[in-house]
Amino acid sequence: MHKTATIVLNRNLPKETNILVEHLMKFDDDYTDIFVVEAGSDKNNLSKYCTWHVNTKEVVKNGMRYSRGMNYGLLQLWKSKRWEEYDSFFLITNDTKFPNNQHTILTLQELMIKNQRLGIISPCSKNWGEKDLIGENSLKYFW
C-alpha cells in the first residue's frame, strides 16, 4: 500500500483546519499520515491536530506563507527520519475544499500509480481560469 504524508498549513483558523483534517481522517486514514504546521497561530487558535507550532517572533508577526510553511513541515519529517515512510507528499492549506463523501488521497494515489511519469499533482478546478494555462495536449485530471 502506498502511504502519503499530508501537511496542512494553518494560521489562526482552527475550526477550518479541524474540519479538513477530520475529512481526511474519515475517508483516507489508511492512506495518509496528517501533520499540521501552525504558522504563527495564537495559542488560543491552534488546531486540535497541531503537530508543529512555529511561534518565533518573526513568524507570529508575518506568518510563514505557503512555501516556507511547507518546507518547514517537510524538513521536520526529514529530521525525524520519517521521510522514507512515504511514497508521496500532499501539501495543502487549511482552506482547501474536498468533494463531499469521497476519498481524496486514495484517488490521487491511484492517479500516480496509473501514470508512472506523473511527478506533481496540483489543484486546479474546472472553474478556475488557471486551467486555460495548462494547454490542450497536457495531462489533466479533475476530481
Can you annotate each of these PLM segments?
Residues 100-120:
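Conserved donor-nucleotide/metal-binding helix-loop-beta segment in metal-dependent transferases, i.e.
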